[in-house]
Amino acid sequence: MKINVFGATLQAGVLAGLFAEHGHQVFWCPNELVREDQVHYQNEDVNRLIEQQVLSGFLHIGSFDELPLDNDVHVFSYAATEQDRALALLDRIHQIIDKPKGLFINGSTFGLHGTEQLKQKLNTENWAYLPDVIQEGNALGSFTYAKQVIVGVDHDAVKSMMQELLRPFFQFQHQYLFMPILDAEFTKLSISGMLAMRIGYMNDLALVSEKLGIDIFNVQQGLAADNRIGSAYLSAGAGFGGENFSHDILTLSNTVSDIGVQSQLLEQI
């Protein structure tokens, strides 16, 4: 396939590199406003993958004007605060192509109905939502070794397109968790909320343990030994969850408030 990737998020870099590694011709536009020939992340594995794929000729990094807009797949992966940029880009594409073809994927976390707002800019129903679940400390593995991939689709035809695109990474039917786009958007925010509650609880336990002279590490091990809980995200502290974690929590809290539901737990987070 020929794939366009727009945006400079860690998800954009991971997808651009991995798609190229699996033989797709990938055209990556990190910044549609100015030309950027290189993109550097704090994750050296991602940087190395990108460099290798550029040298192999499967990954091309360039400006918007250099991208062929008749490619098979178009991925939009912008930061949560860059929605206006994404919408402006789609306006620009619409001016060039009135009836776009191919698959359009929103990987950006713009909150509920974010994908719908992008969809309104282009005259096509072939939109999917691929939640950004890339972990900063495990960028490549968090995608390639995921047990299941959440995909938001509103049409069966798009479901087939997404399976074809992701088959190198997810070969079995049970690995796909398809749901309506709006459900997938809310699920993405809910995941961030659940992680925040878990780490917040551990922070509280750490404070109590310190007061009582208890080793929090022993408590963590005990919690991890219970298979209902598991070992993930049991370390007290901050700095986890990905690039847009804080924004996700705020968006989730605002969404709950906007529909008139009071959640003391979300407010505490």
Go through the PLM ranges and name each one.
Residues 22, 116-128, 139-231, 255-259:
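Internal alpha-helical scaffold of NAD(P)-dependent oxidoreductase catalytic cores
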Residues 1-44:
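NAD(P)+-binding Rossmann beta1-loop-alpha1 motif at the extreme N-terminus of oxidoreductases
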Residues 5-8, 15-18, 22, 249, ...:
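ATP-dependent carboxylate/acyl-activation modules
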Residues 29-72, 80-86:
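Conserved N-terminal Rossmann-fold NAD(P) cofactor-binding segment
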Residues 76-79, 108, 154:
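Glycine-rich, N-terminal phosphate-binding loop of Rossmann-like dinucleotide-binding domains
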Residues 81-139:
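Rossmann-like NAD(P)(H) cofactor-binding subdomain of soluble oxidoreductases
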